[in-house]
C-alpha cells in the first residue's frame, strides 16, 4: 500500500485497488472520472469512492480505485446523458472477524459491516475504510466539455434489522471535491 508520502493515483490497470492521496498534488493526471481534458482514461480509472480512514490521530481522506469492483461495460452504458452512479445494497457476506496471512495474489473483496466499507487486499493485509457523512460536489477545475453540476450525498441508513450500513459508489465526468465542515483533510499524507 502507499506510504505516508504517497502523492500519486492509480495510472495503470495493474494498480487497481491502490489508495492515493488527494491533498498533496499528483504524479499522474489529476483525478477526473469520465471524458475531460487532462483526466485519467476511462479504461484505466472507471470510477472511485471517497472514503475516510479512521485513525487515532485524526481524520484522513483518501480515494480507492473501483476498477475491480465495477465492470467497465456498466460505466460505458451511462457515459452519455446523466452522470451515472452505483449504489451497493446492504446485503452480502459479513466481514471476517479473523484474517489470514498475506498471499501472493492481489484480491479485492467487499463485505457488509456497520458504518464501513471493507476492502480486502490479501497481498498486504486487510484495510478497513470508514465512510464519513457528507457529500461530494463536481468542480469545473478539470476544464473541457460542458460542465454539469451535481452533488453526491453519502449517508447512513438502517435496514429492517436495524443494522446501520453504508454502501454508496458513483461516477462523475468532472473532478470531485469533498464538502463537509466537520471533515478536515490533512496534507501530511496517508499511513
Curated annotation (Swiss-Prot):
Pfam families: HERV-K_env_2 (PF13804). Keywords: Cleavage on pair of basic residues, ERV, Transposable element, Viral envelope protein, Virion. Cerebellum and testis. It is found in: Virion. It comes from the Eukaryota. Residues 1-191 are annotated as: Truncated surface protein. InterPro entries: HERV-K_env, Retroviral_env_glycoprotein. Intergenic, closest flanking genes being GSTM1 and GSTM5. Belongs to the beta type-B retroviral envelope protein family. HERV class-II K(HML-8) env subfamily. Retroviral envelope proteins mediate receptor recognition and membrane fusion during early infection. Endogenous envelope proteins may have kept, lost or modified their original function during evolution. This is Putative endogenous retrovirus group K member 11-1 Env polyprotein. It comes from Homo sapiens. The gene is ERVK11-1.
Amino acid at each position: 500500500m502507499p506510504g505516508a508520502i504517497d502523492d500519486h493515483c492509480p495510472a495503470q490497470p495493474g494498480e487497481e485497488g491502490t489508495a492515493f492521496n488527494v491533498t498533496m498534488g499528483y504524479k499522474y493526471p489529476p483525478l477526473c472520472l469520465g471524458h475531460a481534458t487532462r483526466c485519467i482514461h476511462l479504461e484505466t480509472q472507471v470510477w472511485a469512492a471517497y472514503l475516510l480512514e479512521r485513525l487515532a490521530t485524526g481524520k484522513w481522506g483518501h480515494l480507492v480505485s473501483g476498477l475491480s469492483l465495477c465492470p467497465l461495460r456498466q460505466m460505458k452504458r451511462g457515459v452519455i446523458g446523466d452522470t451515472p452512479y452505483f449504489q451497493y445494497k446492504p446485503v452480502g457476506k459479513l466481514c471476517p472477524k479473523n484474517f489470514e496471512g498475506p498471499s501472493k495474489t492481489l484480491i479485492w473483496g467487499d463485505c457488509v459491516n456497520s458504518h464501513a466499507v471493507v476492502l480486502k487486499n490479501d497481498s498486504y493485509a486487510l484495510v478497513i475504510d470508514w465512510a464519513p457523512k457528507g457529500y461530494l460536489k463536481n468542480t469545473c477545475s478539470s476544464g473541457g466539455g460542458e460542465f454539469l453540476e451535481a452533488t453526491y450525498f453519502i449517508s447512513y441508513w438502517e435496514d429492517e434489522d436495524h443494522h446501520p450500513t453504508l454502501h454508496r459508489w458513483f461516477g462523475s465526468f468532472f473532478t470531485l471535491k469533498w464538502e463537509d465542515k466537520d471533515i478536515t483533510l490533512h496534507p501530511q499524507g496517508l499511513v
